[in-house]
From Swiss-Prot:
It holds the Pfam family AMMECR1. This is Protein PH0010. Transmembrane segments: none annotated. Residues 8-202 form the AMMECR1 domain. It comes from Pyrococcus horikoshii (strain ATCC 700860 / DSM 12428 / JCM 9974 / NBRC 100139 / OT-3).
């Protein structure tokens, strides 16, 4: 895989995400992009910020995850916004408190633009790969997204991944077999803290 995001940029984004959350929890204000932001991070890209509780099994660790699937903001700005939203606006969880940040690991996933999976619906499992792709399912007003790391953490195969993304969208788990359902795939470069406030590493999926 050809990496677009350098390791030092990934480290920059994870540290920025943590600072954005902690400053917002202290002041209620969104921080400005730092003056030393690498110019490449002003390119518009999709990004998600995930907060995981430290030393907890992956299936129960999630504390918040929100982002932008499509490149609508410069990456540095999108990371700040997604970080804050993941901490205080994820409807699945109560807002994060400042003291929790000592026990949360920050993860940033930089996304490629979503690509529509063409062809007959029954061929969709063969056109995706667990450990590489994330998925977006859309039908009517419903949509759902799962990042590439999710099926790896849960041990799903391709069909299970499709079914779970349908479920995330609020649709029946077999909706991926419907021609009216659009399925998109994307890849992500993922960076995470090894432990809260710790060193930052690129996260391999397989």
């Amino acid at each position: 895989m050809v990496f677009k995001i350098k390791d030092e940029w990934g480290e920059f984004l994870v540290r920025l995400a943590r600072r954005a959350i902690e400053e917002y929890l202290k002041t209620g204000k969104e921080i400005e992009p730092p003056k030393d932001t690498p110019p490449e991070l002003w390119e518009k890209m999709g990004v998600f910020v995930t907060l995981n509780r430290y030393n907890v099994p992956p299936q129960t660790a999630l504390r918040g995850c929100i982002g932008f699937p499509t490149p609508i903001y410069p990456l540095v700005e999108a990371t700040i916004k997604a970080a804050i939203y993941s901490a205080v606006d994820d409807p699945r969880f109560p807002p994060v408190k400042l003291e929790e940040m000592d026990n949360l690991v920050v993860e940033v996933s930089v996304l490629t633009p979503p690509e529509l999976i063409e062809g007959p619906p029954e061929e969709r499992p063969r056109k995706i790969k667990v450990g590489r792709d994330g998925l977006i399912v859309e039908k009517g007003i419903y949509s759902g997204l799962l990042l590439p790391q999710v099926p790896v953490e849960w041990g799903w195969d391709e069909e299970e991944f499709l079914a779970e993304t349908c479920w995330k969208a609020g649709l029946p788990p077999d909706c991926w077999l419907d021609e009216d359902t659009k399925v998109y795939k994307f890849t992500a470069e993922i960076f995470e803290e090894e432990y809260p406030r710790g060193p930052i590493k690129r996260k391999p999926l397989v």
